[in-house]
Amino acid sequence: MPKAEGRIFDFKGHDAIRTDFLEAIDFDGKDEYIKIETDEFSAVCPFSGLPDIGRVIIEYYPDGGKIVELKSLKYYFVSFRNVGIYQEEATKRIYEDLKNLLKTDRIRVTVIYNIRGGIKTTTQMGSLEGKKSGEVE
């Protein structure tokens, strides 16, 4: 992997992400649209060791009969704080972890990262449409 010039800060590996912090609550409302937002997400760029800070938007329908417990979600996000993970990987990881927890195909995760080096990055995974007919897992 290429290395950044200058000072590089230490960071943790992906195994420090605490998926076990996530908790789901039983919920009977499959057609209710749920949107969760936080401006407090941060991880570490594995190239430079500098912080990547962003706004996370989670949208979903609780088709699996579950909703995410918000305090557990906050603790899960905090576990990313010292993890070296690329922006695109972080979005994919959050999407996959929540999709597995909530057992829904109608989920979308968007992360809008703070501008760094004059570049604004937005990453997104998922869809609120769910699976299309004939789609293979």
UniProtKB/Swiss-Prot annotation:
Which pathway, metabolic or otherwise, does it act in? tRNA modification; tRNA-queuosine biosynthesis
Protein family per UniProt: Belongs to the GTP cyclohydrolase I family. QueF type 1 subfamily.
Query: What are the leading ranks of the lineage?
Result: Bacteria, Thermotogati, Thermotogota, Thermotogae, Thermotogales
Q: Which UniProt keywords apply?
A: Cytoplasm, NADP, Oxidoreductase, Queuosine biosynthesis
Q: What is its EC number?
A: 1.7.1.13
- Record's protein name: NADPH-dependent 7-cyano-7-deazaguanine reductase
Gene name for this UniProt entry: queF
Q: Which Pfam families does the record cross-reference, listed alphabetically?
A: QueF
- Sites binding substrate sit at 68-70, 87-88
Record-linked InterPro entries: GTP-CH-I_C/QueF (IPR043133), NADPH_dep_7-cyano-7-deazaG_red (IPR050084), QueF (IPR029500), QueF_type1 (IPR016856)
HAMAP family registered for this protein in UniProt: QueF_type1
